């Protein structure tokens, strides 16, 4: 069940509606619901959705390439790419007149292993994809990296983004939507325990009572309101 985030979805739809190349940045602390928001947004769109991991440059390239092939040439497994430029060139040649969303989730994991990734991405946005209907979403949980390496004036990508979203915890009203049949008191308890963090709210079964749900929620870090 997807709950709330109407303003963020509207912003993303506005971003998507514009023709041409575009880039947006979504960031926020872990478990806040960034990936869920993006998944909801792209559910009816042609999308390459890659979630980077701490596995090194070569392995991220390999797995990203598979996601690209799955969109443009599903079922084809005998194509390999020896560089990120080769994958980006493949996207350029196959995008045609389609509008494609390109998501790189947990970007810092990859970019920290490949110092050239952001500058290569900047080159393609400026000179190669500039006439394509390609919508790029860069997402990350490492706030310092996203703010200093992606959003700051020192970033190769500075001036390229159309918008940005810093995703925060749900407020009380949106948190209450996860348990619509609860009393106001129990809704307040749920909000107080979860801090509006999407991951914890998603663990709640609205068919169970408050005590049953609280016994299922094991919060491993303190929440902040």
Language-model segments: residues:
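Conserved NTP-binding/hydrolysis module of P-loop NTPases
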Residues: 44-48, 58-77
């Amino acid at each position: 069940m997807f709950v709330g985030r109407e303003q963020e979805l509207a912003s993303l739809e506005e971003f998507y509606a514009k023709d041409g190349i575009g880039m947006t940045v979504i960031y926020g602390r872990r478990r806040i619901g960034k990936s869920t928001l993006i998944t909801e947004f792209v559910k009816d769109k042609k999308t390459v959705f890659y979630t980077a991991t701490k596995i090194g440059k070569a392995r991220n390239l390999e797995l990203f390439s598979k996601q690209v092939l799955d969109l443009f040439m599903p079922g084809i497994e005998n194509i390999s790419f020896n560089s990120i430029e080769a994958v980006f060139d493949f996207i350029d040649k196959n995008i045609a007149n389609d509008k494609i969303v390109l998501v790189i989730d947990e970007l810092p994991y990859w970019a920290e292993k490949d110092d050239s990734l952001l500058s290569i991405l900047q080159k393609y946005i400026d000179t190669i994809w500039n006439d394509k209907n390609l919508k790029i979403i860069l997402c990350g949980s490492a706030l310092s990296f996203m703010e200093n390496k992606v959003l700051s004036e020192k970033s190769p990508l500075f001036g390229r983004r159309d918008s940005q979203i810093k995703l925060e915890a749900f407020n009380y009203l949106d948190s209450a939507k996860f348990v619509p049949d609860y009393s106001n008191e129990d809704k307040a308890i749920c909000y107080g325990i979860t801090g509006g963090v999407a991951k914890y709210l998603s663990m709640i079964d609205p068919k169970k009572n408050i005590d049953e749900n609280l016994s299922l929620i094991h919060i491993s870090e303190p929440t902040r309101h």
